[in-house]
């Protein structure tokens, strides 16, 4: 009988060493990065990762990565399909499948009674070079509505540039949304609404409600947070998941990608972000009830 090796078989020690070094070199919080690298190496020496399964290793390492400060963007992610070797390409490959299955990230555009439009953006904030065209079409379509409900309950993150692009349709004039700080604490980048967006704007004066759930994450949270902080929208629903640190990805095995936050966002309004706390709704309610609640608020305001 000829033995075969599973395509997802894993040399745990080699993977863990790669993960430890990448975290130590790149995690946005240097002190925590050193702690985590030491923890992973110690746990490996203790036999905590003694498995031949890439999926099991991913679960165990992710639990330890999140044990120091609860950063949900720290993860060793298992992919059933082989991971492209280029940096960050595993997430992009998965995103492409979601993009094609969700009408380019705008699965719902609807006009309801009373002139209230509902626009769902999800399941991701797809890269702007993919998403600009479908978002422009959808946002231009809802521009004449009397009020807008923006549904982010199923949005689990993506591209911050897409967040700024969407905000450009909902705000008047250039608006500073977020400052990204590097590992050294220096300003790495600022996020502003664009000076021009194609198509028609909904604008800054009409009622705007943003729906959230406990699943809303990362860039989905940023869109809700940015609009809330500048006083543009009321957030309706549940507190979000609480991940505010932009991440990058490294392939460390044919089926494993390491996700590491490489910056942290700071709002020019609050001086902080939603890391660990989530975006707190202005109108708390169950996610399943959020649309009806927002519609009732919109109708009352328009009456």
What is each of the regions a protein language model found here?
Residues 19, 65, 119, 150, ...:
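Terminal peptide-recognition signature
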Residues 118-122, 142-157, 211:
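Short acidic catalytic loops
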Residues 157-207, 245-251, 262-264, 268:
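Gly/Ser/Thr-rich loop/hinge elements
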Residues 2, 30-114, 298, 302-303:
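Extended, small/polar residue-biased N-terminal targeting/export presequences
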Residues 127-146:
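A short, well-ordered alpha-helical element
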């Amino acid at each position: 009988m000829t033995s075969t090796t599973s395509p997802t078989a894993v040399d745990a020690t080699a993977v863990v060493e790669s993960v430890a070094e990448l975290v130590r070199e790149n995690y946005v919080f240097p002190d925590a990065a050193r702690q985590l690298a030491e923890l992973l190496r110690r746990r490996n020496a203790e036999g905590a990762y003694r498995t031949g399964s890439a999926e099991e290793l991913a679960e165990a390492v992710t639990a330890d990565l999140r044990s120091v400060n609860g950063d949900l963007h720290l993860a060793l992610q298992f992919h059933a399909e082989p991971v492209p070797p280029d940096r960050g390409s595993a997430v992009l490959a998965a995103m492409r499948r979601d993009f094609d299955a969700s009408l380019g990230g705008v699965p719902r555009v609807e006009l309801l009674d009373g002139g209230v439009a509902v626009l769902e953006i999800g399941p991701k904030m797809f890269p702007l070079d993919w998403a600009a065209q479908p978002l422009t079409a959808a946002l231009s379509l809802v521009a004449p509505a009397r009020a807008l409900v923006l549904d982010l309950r199923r949005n689990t993150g993506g591209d911050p540039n897409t967040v700024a692009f969407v905000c450009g349709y909902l705000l008047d004039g250039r608006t500073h949304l977020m400052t990204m700080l590097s590992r050294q604490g220096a300003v790495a980048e600022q996020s502003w609404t664009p000076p021009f967006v194609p198509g028609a704007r909904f604008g800054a004066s009409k009622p705007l409600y943003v729906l959230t759930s406990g699943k809303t994450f990362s860039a989905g949270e940023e869109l809700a947070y940015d609009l809330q902080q500048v006083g543009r929208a009321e957030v309706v629903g549940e507190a979000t998941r609480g991940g505010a640190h932009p991440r990058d990805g490294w392939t460390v095995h044919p089926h494993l990608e390491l996700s590491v936050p490489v910056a942290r966002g700071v709002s020019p309004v609050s001086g902080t972000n939603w890391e660990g706390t989530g975006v707190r709704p202005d109108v708390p309610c169950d996610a399943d009830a959020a649309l009806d609640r927002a519609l009732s608020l919109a109708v009352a305001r328009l009456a």
